[in-house]
Amino acid sequence: DLVAEHGEIVAVICHQRAREYPVSGGPSSCCRCVDRPDLREYAQRLVRETGYTGLAMFEFKEDGEGHPHLLEVNPRIWGTFPLTRVTGSGIPLLWAILAHNAGNGGAPIPLPEIPVPRQKKMIFAASDLMAGLGYARRGRPGQLFAALGDFLNPAVRDGLFEWGDILPGLAYYRSLITKEKRG
């Protein structure tokens, strides 16, 4: 997950999917920030060679020997984008400043010092609890206990629910409940 300007990465975090919902293949319900210099270097080469400016999410998958392979590059906001905020990476603010500066060459805002991202874990609580149940139904009860532990752990942040602005989180949870009833 990164923001770049003129072929140089301004800020980057690497995240790893821990659980997904639906468990048969869906978006992340739990992810964590990880330190992967090899993936950062790979992304930097592509960003530099293309002169890319903007947001991007590089998705890699490791083969059986642990070698990463690039699956896709999403030049847009992605589902786990809230992790950029949870980790304190500064990516949302930097992206906004770069967008402002692109259209205001005469009055650019200087980029602030880039913070070092914190190694954090994030869940989408409702879908992660349902993922835990789904994994348990598939014979992996440890994932249910992991989801419950993350739900109860105050250090693990929710990607949508914030006490200062509860409506987006409530709308998301409502949509999950109605989807579960239908299907």
Say what each PLM segment does.
Residues 66-75:
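Short glycine/threonine-rich loop-to-helix capping motif typified by GTGT followed
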Residues 53-65:
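A short glycine-rich, hydrophobically flanked beta-strand micro-motif that places a catalytic Asp/Glu
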Residues 1, 15, 61, 123-124:
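Residues in well-ordered beta-strands of folded domains
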Residues 3-9, 63-66, 100-101:
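Short acidic-glycine loop/turn motifs at beta-strand connectors
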